[in-house]
Each structure stands twice: as structure tokens, then as C-alpha cells.
């Protein structure tokens, strides 16, 4: 792959997209076409909450969330890590390979990509990721491959941690000094009347959170996007994967969702 001066692009993929083969195929098709035309390095960071929920239900384990974050008891982290770093990662890698991409499956721990520490004792094995050493990831990107990174990390003591995938994507983008797009089930952030907000500042976002217009998991996403915009010093986009025909425009920098602006 020819190198350009364009910053790498990190795409966070989550929600129901992971359960729809056709959607994933269209998404990877758009990534392959854009990667080829723009000669740009791309990495994917993914969650897989629905897989975890399915597995927890099968094992008759209770799912508890606090402020939009999954409570992960330490005795459950092997199950959750297996679902995210194992099943979800390989499902995505397999689909990318089927669509002609050279995909490499990774986690936040590989090559010291992200430092991870316990976020809150009440949440259990839930980690906060910060940018680490991106040299291994950069070496993989330099081969033209597509890294697909799960949001499972390791602490300095080797403890497995579940990291919210939006927050993990922010840390990976920080490590790479990359642009970031957060793809989800929704078209962006909606106001109280259900209309798409084209841009959002921290002050506006906080008002919508206080007014309970932004709730649950969207609070985590919005906070991650605001944090990323400030840390990276560039706008961050929250958009939907539901319109694959618009993704090439999105990857090229055109806004199709809600942009979060650095303060």
C-alpha cells in the first residue's frame, strides 16, 4: 500500500451490525473500496454486547448495567473475554476475509497498544483504556492489512478487562493519532423531537444529558466522542452503519451523522 500524508482512520463498529452478515459484507465492501482508492490506513475497533448478552443468558448469568456500562464481575470476565476477543473478533475477521480483505484479529493488549486500569471497583473487571505503544499496530497497517481490534485489554498485572468499545476506540485513535468514526445502530444524536443534530458541543451535550434526552449507552458514546475530539484535536463523527452507500463519503470526511467538535 502506498503511504499518503492522510491520518489513519479508526472505525468503531458495534450494535446489531455484528449480527447481520449482509450489513457487514456491505460495510467491508465499502472499506475495501475506500482503502484502495484513498490508499489510507484503516483499523476497526469493535464491541459485541449482543453476543455477550446471548452467552450470559445461555449460562443463566445476570446482565447488570450501571450508567450504560456493563458490570463485569471478575468471575465472569473469562466468559465475556471469550465472547468479545474470541467469537465476535473472529466473526468480524472471517467476514472481512470473505470480502477480500487481509484482516488481522487483535486485542487492546497486543504490542502494548493500550494501557488498561480498573475503571471503578463497583463495575468489576471493567477497564479504562489510555493510548499505549502503537508500533506493532503501525507495522501491521504498513503491510496493507486491516486490523480488527476487540475491546478486551490487560492490566499491567495481566488481569483481563472489559473496556467499553467506544472508549477503547478513542484510546486506539489516540495511540495512532488517527481520525475516528463511531458507527452504531442510530444515525447520530437526536434532539428531544427525534431530529438529527449535525453537531454537538460539550455544553449542549451536557444539557441534553441533564434533560434525559441522551440516556443509557448513548451517554457513554457521547462522552467518548467529546473526550476524543478534545484529546485528538479534531472533529469526531457518530453515525450509523445502516446506509452502506453513504459510508465512503463518511470515510472521506463528509458528515452523515453528528459531529463532536473540539472545545
Swiss-Prot record:
Swiss-Prot/TrEMBL keywords: Amino-acid biosynthesis, Arginine biosynthesis, ATP-binding, Cytoplasm, Kinase, Nucleotide-binding, Transferase
Superkingdom of the organism of origin: Bacteria
Statement: the UniProt record of this protein carries the keyword tRNA-binding: no
Catalytic activity: N-acetyl-L-glutamate + ATP = N-acetyl-L-glutamyl 5-phosphate + ADP
Binding-site residues, substrate: 48-49, 70, 162
UniProt entry tagged with the keyword Hydrolase: no
Localization per record: Cytoplasm
GO cellular component, one term: cytoplasm
EC number: 2.7.2.8
GO terms under biological process: arginine biosynthetic process via ornithine; L-arginine biosynthetic process
Disulfide cross-links: none
Pathway(s) the chain acts in: Amino-acid biosynthesis; L-arginine biosynthesis; N(2)-acetyl-L-ornithine from L-glutamate: step 2/4
Swiss-Prot/TrEMBL site (Transition state stabilizer) positions: 12, 221
GO molecular function, one term: ATP binding
Matches recorded under Gene3D superfamilies: Acetylglutamate kinase-like (3.40.1160.10)
UniProt cross-references to InterPro entries, sorted A to Z: AceGlu_kinase-like_sf, AcgluKinase_fam, ArgB, Asp/Glu/Uridylate_kinase, NAGK-NC
Principal location: cytoplasm
Pfam families, per database record: AA_kinase
PANTHER family: N-ACETYLGLUTAMATE SYNTHASE (PTHR23342), N-ACETYLGLUTAMATE SYNTHASE, MITOCHONDRIAL (PTHR23342:SF0)
Similarity section: Belongs to the acetylglutamate kinase family. ArgB subfamily.
Role according to the record: Catalyzes the ATP-dependent phosphorylation of N-acetyl-L-glutamate.
Protein name stated in the entry: Acetylglutamate kinase
Organism expressing this protein natively: Vibrio parahaemolyticus serotype O3:K6 (strain RIMD 2210633)
